[in-house]
């Protein structure tokens, strides 16, 4: 039998193929884990570990429309492809190698497609996904450089792989549904408990006059009060926007939401030593130019999240709402700075950061600070608990008595 990538006399090549497959598996497992952690967190104390900047971050991918297919995370298909490469290296055969070589082509095409989608549509790049891209392209190179010349795949193996892949996909789909259901049940109850365990904090000395929901003239008079420190170019803030947009409708007349500008850009924010989102300051100035137009501008920015990263789009936005002067208006700049600087009023919650408000989004819900975003189910559970508790909501240990199961009723 002729020497090839995984067959006789090619121990070194088999090792590299095994390494590529193992890398594909590792990157896929981490990607799947991040997908579920981002979309179905099980704690209020959750944080992303690979969001370095507006471009290099994983949350954009985790929240994207193609992050999963009917509940099956995209990373599962990479996991399965990597597993086949590893098995083909450990148990080599001509049929296995030909089939893997055939599949490597489609995997490489998929990788290129995902890379283009990520960079040019999402305008970001997931580091975990990038690891998979690198190992996949290495595997593709090895198969097409050293693989058997006769590359027609084994139909039998393809059929077996298809059945196994569908079986695994079904398992992930069921797991996805279980995680989704749990968000309204036991996980939500745990989050409510964690929420009440948080120490109370005061409201900022200056509450932004820019609100996305108003139930009363005085901020303190609504039963549900949310102050959100937000950056318009933060992927997690986009996720939060979608959750609050739905909840603001459901709790209309009972909720006040104040938008506390906190762009993570050194151009206008000196509270945190982060310069992650170029353009966030300009977007904040445009939105703060006219309180009467704030809500419309706020919604348009988030509804065009990817376009908002473009300087040209921001110029068009300012022109559309007559806010061209905002970028150089001293009064608007002073107002924005006054709002941003309230982030420095809170005691630090970590030795790593100087202040409590250090990232976006940061929420203050009825005088308790939550760092990071929360999904709809968790926010709804907290809101229901606050409404059911009334003035006693501030007492520790009340979450169990105030608990409301928010799961949709099954017919």
Report each predicted region and the residues it spans.
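Membrane-interfacial helix-loop segments of redox and metal-homeostasis proteins
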Residues: 2-177
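Soluble or luminal CAZymes and related metallo-dependent hydrolases
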Residues: 10, 278, 282, 331-339
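C-terminal cap of thioredoxin/glutaredoxin-like
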Residues: 242-248, 315-411
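Post-signal/leader-peptide non-cytosolic segments of secretory proteins
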Residues: 69, 199-211, 399-404, 408
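Structural alpha/beta surface segment adjacent to cysteine/selenocysteine redox centers
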Residues: 227-232, 238-319, 353-355, 394-410
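Local sequence-structure signature of Cys/Sec-based thiol-disulfide redox active-site neighborhoods
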Residues: 23, 119, 216-246, 359
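Membrane-interface segments at or immediately adjacent to transmembrane helices
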Residues: 175-221, 227
């Amino acid at each position: 039998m002729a020497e090839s990538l995984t067959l006789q006399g090619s121990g070194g090549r088999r090792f590299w193929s095994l390494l590529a497959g193992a890398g594909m598996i590792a990157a896929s497992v981490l990607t799947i884990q991040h997908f579920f952690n981002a979309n179905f967190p099980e704690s209020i104390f959750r944080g992303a570990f690979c969001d370095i900047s507006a471009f290099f971050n994983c949350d954009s991918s985790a929240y994207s429309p193609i992050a999963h297919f009917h509940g099956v995370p995209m990373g599962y298909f990479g996991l399965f492809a990597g597993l086949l490469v590893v098995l083909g290296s450990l148990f080599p055969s001509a049929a296995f190698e030909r089939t893997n070589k055939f599949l490597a082509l489609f995997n490489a095409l998929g990788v290129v497609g995902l890379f283009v989608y990520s960079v040019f549509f999402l305008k970001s790049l997931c580091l975990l996904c990038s690891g998979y891209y690198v190992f996949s392209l290495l595997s593709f190179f090895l198969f097409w450089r050293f693989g058997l010349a006769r590359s027609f795949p084994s139909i039998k193996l393809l059929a077996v792989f298809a059945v196994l892949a569908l079986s695994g996909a079904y398992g992930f789909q069921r797991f996805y549904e279980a995680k989704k259901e749990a968000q309204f049940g036991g996980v939500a109850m745990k989050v409510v408990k964690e929420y009440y365990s948080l120490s109370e904090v005061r409201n900022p000395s200056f509450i932004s006059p820019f609100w996305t929901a108003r139930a009363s003239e005085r901020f303190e008079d609504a039963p549900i009060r949310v102050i959100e420190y937000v950056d318009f170019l933060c992927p997690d803030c986009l996720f939060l926007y979608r959750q609050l947009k739905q909840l603001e409708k459901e709790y209309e007349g009972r909720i006040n939401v104040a938008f506390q500008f906190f762009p993570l850009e050194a151009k206008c924010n000196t509270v945190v030593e982060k310069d992650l989102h170029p353009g966030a300051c300009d977007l904040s100035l445009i939105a703060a130019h006219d309180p009467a137009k704030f809500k419309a501008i706020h919604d348009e920015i988030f509804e065009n999240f990817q376009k908002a990263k473009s300087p040209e789009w921001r110029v068009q936005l300012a022109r559309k709402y007559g806010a061209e002067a905002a970028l150089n208006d001293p009064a608007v700049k002073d107002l924005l700075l006054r709002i941003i600087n309230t982030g420095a009023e809170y005691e630090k919650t970590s030795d790593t950061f100087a202040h409590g408000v250090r990232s976006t989004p940061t929420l203050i819900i009825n005088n308790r600070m939550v760092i990071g975003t929360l999904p709809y189910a968790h926010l709804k559970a907290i809101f229901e608990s606050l409404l059911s508790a009334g003035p006693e909501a501030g007492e520790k240990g009340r979450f169990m008595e105030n608990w409301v199961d928010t799961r949709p009723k099954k017919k």
